[in-house]
């Protein structure tokens, strides 16, 4: 029984794990300035980072949470996931392997 590539139904693991994973990755990219500020603060503060980096941590959480709670952002990530899944069902090749360059012999 082959799976329909155009099927839009999502399993629980896709809704609860795979799409949120894409959301986290995209949100980190979009909040890159806050991620860099927090990372820099942590590196410079050592053991005291919990106390010294509260401002940077709050800014990062605020940025990420804004994306996590945005229904349009969820839909964008869901459509990206469905597109990847459809391509996998057509070709049988995972996205990661498709994006890798093929070795060339010369």
Curated annotation (Swiss-Prot):
Q: Please give the Pfam families that the UniProt record associates with this protein.
A: Cmc1
Q: Which residues carry this modification: N-acetylalanine?
A: 2
A GO molecular-function term, please?
Answer: metal ion binding
Compartments (UniProt record):
Mitochondrion
Q: Which GO terms describe its cellular component?
A: mitochondrial matrix; mitochondrion
Q: Which residues form the CHCH domain?
A: 28-71
Q: Give the residue ranges of motif Cx9C motif 1.
A: 31-41
Q: Which UniProt keywords apply?
A: Acetylation, Copper, Disulfide bond, Metal-binding, Mitochondrion
User: What's the superkingdom here?
Assistant: Eukaryota
Disulfides per UniProt? 31-63, 41-53
- Family recorded in the similarity comment: Belongs to the CMC family.
Free-text function comment from the UniProt entry: Component of the MITRAC (mitochondrial translation regulation assembly intermediate of cytochrome c oxidase complex) complex, that regulates cytochrome c oxidase assembly.
PANTHER family xref list: COX ASSEMBLY MITOCHONDRIAL PROTEIN, COX ASSEMBLY MITOCHONDRIAL PROTEIN HOMOLOG
The UniProt subunit note reads as follows:
Component of the MITRAC (mitochondrial translation regulation assembly intermediate of cytochrome c oxidase complex) complex, the core components of this complex being COA3/MITRAC12 and COX14.
Q: What is this protein's record name?
A: COX assembly mitochondrial protein homolog
Q: Which organism is it from?
A: Homo sapiens
Q: Which gene encodes it?
A: CMC1
């Amino acid at each position: 029984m082959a799976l329909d590539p155009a099927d839009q139904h999502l399993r629980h693991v896709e809704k609860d794990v795979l799409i949120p994973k894409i959301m986290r990755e995209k949100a980190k990219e979009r909040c890159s300035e806050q991620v860099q500020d927090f990372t820099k603060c942590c590196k410079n503060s050592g053991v005291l980072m919990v106390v010294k980096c509260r401002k940077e941590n709050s800014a990062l959480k605020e940025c990420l949470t804004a994306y996590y709670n945005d229904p349009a952002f969820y839909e964008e990530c869901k459509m990206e996931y469905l597109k990847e899944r459809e391509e996998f069902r057509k070709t049988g090749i995972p996205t990661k392997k498709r994006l890798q360059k093929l070795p060339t012999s010369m």
